[in-house]
């Protein structure tokens, strides 16, 4: 019995030793795996950091610049494209930068802007990020002057015989019109001119190629392909000049001065409309007077803000009001400019062939 107990004790001790050794072996193996896993995590982290360093972050100021740049960077590896404003913002007349906007700009390698003063917040950007590489798309474009469309056109009609108080009111309204979209002395809406927009695309491509020489050939190839499509639009415009050359028109948006210029039309009167102003009775009389005095048969208006005024003057006259897309808002579709401008061209063609 004594020997049996001794044997059981020895067996228990052996089992205990084996279990202890097994636990030690398991912990050693797990430790090795953990070390290997930690090394792998560190390697992945370093890899992710390297990949982040290889990303070129391009931020655009608003919709027209986004669409132009989207065509240039399309398919280029390692490019992140962001737009500062919402796609439905439209022109950046009174756009205020938010903390989120400033945070986005802090990540940017390149900031593509229209230029011409339309981005009124640029002094704040320059102050916050003095080393940010800014591409001004309009830098090689001949901008129109605000005086190229006659917003102070004088006509001899009933409005001139109004009382002094009404006359003063009209001048105040005209001052409102002149200052509503004030970008300085230049008309910054150059993307509405197809040949100027083509130049802007080339400028953006050249500057991106300088910044990211590794992908320069891709930027230039994309710009060339996009330019070929834009050239077709310009050819269509030129083919219609036999109808439009020298025609007097009225425009209800400053951007349409560029449309008039492309078609060799004379914008004899500008009434710049937006959501911030109402039209006075005196202004309506002036527009009707301009239609009669200058033989205007077509008005270019924006559907969003010019619908009521367009209806008013078309009811009083035989003028044809067409609603042109200012191409400053829309979907993030790289062909949206092509579609929008094609539609504008067709509307103008129809207006002058009726």
Which residues fall in each region the model found?
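Extracytoplasmic metal-acquisition and chelation regions
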Residues: 2-354
